[in-house]
């Protein structure tokens, strides 16, 4: 029968703890790799679905051209993602091949985003703006900058607005028009 000294047992346990740390509260097993790539995953899934729906040939050149044209219509965080990928005219780097090559063999968007994260961590740091339900929020309690942002997200602008009440009145006036197309407004 083999008996280890207490020091050896403590050293062994410490080694196990370092090599396999215990998850702390709030931490998820496996780190849920896709949880932080929401913009990338959503965008690439929508892009892939559009290619499938239109019956596009999955060659590298075709996917690259389609991705660049798909990025022309993007706004906000998705436009920023296109910039990071190099699919916009003003992009500094071009890593489109890191999307087109895996997509040509029908790799899932989540796996593509994980690979992109290794190249540029900013890609997975993108998050969609929280959405605002105009029916449940009191516009009078919001800041003017937030009210301007609502109008900007609708593509509207108030040049004659001098006070906060002007912005509130304009948003309430335009809300039925945009509530039909956008049930929730980005804030």
Curated annotation (Swiss-Prot):
InterPro entries: ARMET-like (IPR045333), ARMET_C (IPR019345), ARMET_N (IPR045332), SAP_dom_sf (IPR036361). It is found in: Secreted. It holds the Pfam family ARMET_C. Belongs to the ARMET family. One of its GO terms (biological process) is dopaminergic neuron differentiation. The keyword Disulfide bond applies. GO terms for cellular component: endoplasmic reticulum; extracellular space. Keywords: Disulfide bond, Growth factor, Secreted, Signal. It comes from the Eukaryota. Residues 1-24 form the signal peptide. Induction: Not induced by endoplasmic reticulum stress. It comes from Homo sapiens. Trophic factor for dopamine neurons. Prevents the 6-hydroxydopamine (6-OHDA)-induced degeneration of dopaminergic neurons. When administered after 6-OHDA-lesioning, restores the dopaminergic function and prevents the degeneration of dopaminergic neurons in substantia nigra. This is Cerebral dopamine neurotrophic factor. The lineage of its organism: Eukaryota, Metazoa, Chordata, Craniata, Vertebrata. Disulfide bonds join 37-124, 40-113, 71-82.
């Amino acid at each position: 029968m083999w008996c280890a000294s207490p020091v050896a047992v403590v050293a062994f346990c410490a080694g196990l703890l370092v090599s396999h740390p215990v998850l702390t509260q709030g931490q998820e097993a496996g780190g849920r790799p896709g949880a932080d790539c929401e913009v990338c995953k959503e965008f690439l899934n929508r892009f892939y679905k559009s290619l499938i729906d239109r019956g596009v040939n999955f060659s590298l050149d075709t996917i690259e051209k389609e991705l660049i044209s798909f990025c022309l219509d993007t706004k906000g965080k998705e436009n920023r993602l296109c910039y990071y990928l190099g699919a916009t005219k003003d992009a500094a780097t071009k890593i489109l091949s890191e999307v087109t090559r895996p997509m040509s063999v029908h790799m899932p968007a989540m796996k593509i985003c994980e690979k992109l994260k290794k190249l540029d961590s900013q890609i997975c740091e993108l998050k969609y703006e929280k959405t605002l339900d105009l029916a449940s929020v009191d516009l009078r309690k919001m800041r003017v900058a937030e009210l301007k942002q609502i109008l900007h997200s609708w593509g509207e602008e108030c040049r004659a607005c001098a006070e906060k009440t002007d912005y509130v009145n304009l948003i309430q006036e335009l809300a039925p028009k945009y509530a039909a197309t956008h049930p929730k407004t980005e804030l």
